[in-house]
Design a protein with these regions (language model features):
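Bacterial N-terminal signal peptides
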Residues: 7-18
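Charged, low-complexity C-terminal accessory regions
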Residues: 22-27, 33, 146-180
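Short, charged N-terminal beta->alpha structural module
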Residues: 27-52
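Structural recognition of alpha->loop->beta junctions
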Residues: 124-156
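Positively charged n-region of N-terminal signal peptides that target proteins for export
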Residues: 1-4
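Ser/Thr/Gly-rich flexible loops in soluble cytosolic domains mediating phosphotransfer, phosphorylation
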Residues: 95-129, 171-180
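A short, gly/pro- and small-residue-rich
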Residues: 86-110, 157-164
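A short, well-structured beta->alpha microelement
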Residues: 50-70
């Protein structure tokens, strides 16, 4: 019985921490751009979740620096998919170059950048980790499916920047509603 109550208390605490951390992310300013780094399906999932939350985002799979400069907020979904690379005709080198371009433009134009990783532990392979290493320093805030943070990578890498750990991907809808 003690284990049951301890589990309930721990779950409630994690939920409260997630909500408290969300306050570190400012209200979303429009227009909002949604793009992918790594061409995994996560950005498509994020697009659907944003629609359900009634948060308007322009989804551009291959956004470039010129695109970014037109937006006040940018969500970048990071996760490498070899199938996505093949379908898109890109590779790690071309995605790295695009990443550098969009982050340079975001900094120059003052675009608030939120890194999103909702693929879970399955999207923490070697290539995704390389893309994350490129992207993490440039983000202003992070929204991560908590299973992807089992090793504490995002907690450590985020440092003092806002980090929201979601227990379920569907919790993104509530978070987006809070931020709009």
């Amino acid at each position: 019985m003690k284990k049951f109550f301890a589990t309930i208390a721990a779950t409630a605490l994690m939920y409260c921490i997630g909500i408290a951390q969300a306050t570190g992310i400012p209200q979303l300013k429009t227009p909002i751009l949604l793009t992918s780094l790594g061409q995994a399906a996560d950005a498509h999932t994020m697009s659907v979740l944003a629609k359900r939350a009634k948060v308007p985002m322009d989804f551009k799979t291959f956004a470039n620096g010129t695109d970014v400069s037109k937006y006040k907020t940018m969500f970048v979904c990071v996760g490498v998919s070899l199938k996505g690379f093949g379908s898109a005709g890109v590779n790690l080198d071309t995605e790295t170059a695009r990443a550098n371009d969009i982050f340079k433009s975001a900094k120059a134009s003052g675009t608030y950048t939120i890194l999103v990783h909702i693929g879970g532990s399955e999207r923490r392979d070697q290539m995704s980790n390389k893309m994350l290493e490129i992207a993490m320093p440039h983000a202003d805030a992070y929204i991560v499916y908590d299973q992807a943070n089992a090793d504490g990578y995002f907690t450590k890498s985020a440092g003092s920047k806002p980090l929201v750990l979601l227990p379920k991907t569907m919790k993104m809808i509530n978070l987006l509603k809070e931020l709009k």
